[in-house]
């Protein structure tokens, strides 16, 4: 009896198989995920995935793709599988040591740039909870004559951020391991302080999508009982590190704007503003340093 011939997998067949598999497992955007993984594995863009759909896959390519599909089945984020995520038009290296940069956080960059448009070219900026460094590095590249200090409590996160700064040519960024302001040099003054702190309420962590809950660093997510533990500390201490007229801008979670605004008001900040993200959710609260 003759052996049955082995199936020849084409790019198109693999995309369909992965799409059907992801859809059956309840993964959002199954077709997009399949195309992105195939494009990444083959080193081509998504357009070529469609154009070359009839091209047979080499055994090594098929093996790599099957491994990627298996990992995605387990909800490992696409950004970790690719090792990269775009932010503000730049490719940032990411892995499980850091939170994945999201489009919502681009709002934080926009607010910082808009509220410091009047500041001299030698702007001094502090970015707390920097993670991958996406905010600090983006601001450094957008304002190349500025001086940026990026801090994080995690040495692992700082290693990723340093690599991103080097790869993206952000040579005006310095890094410090610090639990919020703990290791920021006394007497330092900044024109703007940005922060994307953990802001998800502890009780809500288990209800997050598996991609987030099971893979992204919990320390970068858990903001305490009401999600505002870190926000309170930052709002309270930041004036000691802001120059006259300096701006504090903090990213927050959905529904947290009223309480965060109240914290700013109670601490005496002025010109308080709330900015919405691309999804029209109140995402960033900012204010000017209180006098005195």
Q: Which functions belong to the PLM regions below?
A:
Residues 1-30:
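Non-catalytic nucleic-acid substrate-recognition regions in nucleic-acid-modifying enzymes
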Residues 2, 31, 36-115:
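Conserved AdoMet
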Residues 37, 75, 105, 135, ...:
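Residue-level signal for inorganic ion chemistry
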Residues 82, 177-178, 252, 276:
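Short loop/edge segments at beta-strand edges and connector loops
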Residues 103-207, 255:
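Conserved SAM/SAH cofactor-binding pocket of Class I
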Residues 199-230:
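Mobile active-site "lid"/loop adjacent to the S-adenosyl-L-methionine
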């Amino acid at each position: 009896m003759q052996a049955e011939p082995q199936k020849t997998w084409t790019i198109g067949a693999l995309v369909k198989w992965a799409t059907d598999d992801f859809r059956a497992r309840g993964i959002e955007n199954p077709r997009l995920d399949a195309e992105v993984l195939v494009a990444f594995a083959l080193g081509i863009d998504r357009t070529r995935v469609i154009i070359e759909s009839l091209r047979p896959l080499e055994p090594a390519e098929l093996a790599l793709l099957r491994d990627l599909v298996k990992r995605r089945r387990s909800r490992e984020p696409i950004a970790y599988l690719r090792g990269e995520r775009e932010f503000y038009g730049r490719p940032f290296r990411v892995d499980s040591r850091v939170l994945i940069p999201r489009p919502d956080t681009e709002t934080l960059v926009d607010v910082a740039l808009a509220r410091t448009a009047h500041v001299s070219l030698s702007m001094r900026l502090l970015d707390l909870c920097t993670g991958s460094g996406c905010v600090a590095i983006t601001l450094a590249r957008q304002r190349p004559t500025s001086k940026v200090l990026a801090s994080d409590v995690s040495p692992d996160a700082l290693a990723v951020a340093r690599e991103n700064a080097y790869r993206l040519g952000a040579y005006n960024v310095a890094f410090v391991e610090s639990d919020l302001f703990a290791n920021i040099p006394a007497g330092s003054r900044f024109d703007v302080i940005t922060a994307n702190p953990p802001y998800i309420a502890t009780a809500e962590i288990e209800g997050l999508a598996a991609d987030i809950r099971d893979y992204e660093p919990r320390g970068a997510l858990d903001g305490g009982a009401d999600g505002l533990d870190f926000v309170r500390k930052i709002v309270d201490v930041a004036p000691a590190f802001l120059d006259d007229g300096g701006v504090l801008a903090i990213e927050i979670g959905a529904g947290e704007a009223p309480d965060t605004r109240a914290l700013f008001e109670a601490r005496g900040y002025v010109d308080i503003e709330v900015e919405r993200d691309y999804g029209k959710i109140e995402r960033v609260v900012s204010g000017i340093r209180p006098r005195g």
